[in-house]
């Protein structure tokens, strides 16, 4: 015993020092330990496939033969294949049709539901449900029933003297079916628009009303400018989603007829899991990724011309 302390207490041989160090380490790194499972999952299911697909895109890789480096040959095949280019054109057409139509419809419904009307909570839920069920098999069956030759849509049209139309058998008709399906799933942007509308101060509407502005003038001069950040957010997220659309064409039309509804995501699926051409599928996916990133960059660049952000004082 030296200086009132035993040899064990001074040297920490009893393990107390190690315990203190462990507790201190745990206290400082508890956050890292908590997110470690997420990082492991991210690395396995996101990061590894992301990097692997980039490598595969430069290889002639089929599940049934050894991968060989092929450079840019997959990308050259994509640019030279009219069927693949048709899928890209159809995807552009699909995205730039559905995004504005869906957002306009979502904003219109959100504007109506923003008023104090009876049963508003029921309607909010009812309008949101399709966005949850849009990719289910039951919705595919329902949509086929609605648009088949003897379906409900043609039955209603016949009441007005319109001849039945083979929606799912006609290339143009089938394309509009999947467009209508996606517009019908406007629930997610509607909820976001509704939250933005509730954030607009009533004082601004009162001031505009005093200046003689009617409802329409208030909507376009007060409401729209103040919710442009939300419009921008919905536009970017929906544009990215539409370029990656898979469920609608897959479960309703299977890409037909005559490949009229074969979008790029479905093309990636067909190459990867039907033809087992993983190299080609990866190249198509990466080309789609570059297109989405480019369009997103253009959207972010354009926001300074039309998106209104209030300053720190809320002005």
Residue ranges and their predicted role:
Residues 5-11, 263, 284:
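A composition-driven signal for long, intrinsically disordered, charge-rich low-complexity tracts
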Residues 6-26:
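Short, Lys/Arg-rich, polar N-terminal cytosolic tail immediately upstream
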Residues 23-315:
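A structural signal for multi-pass alpha-helical bundles of membrane permease subunits
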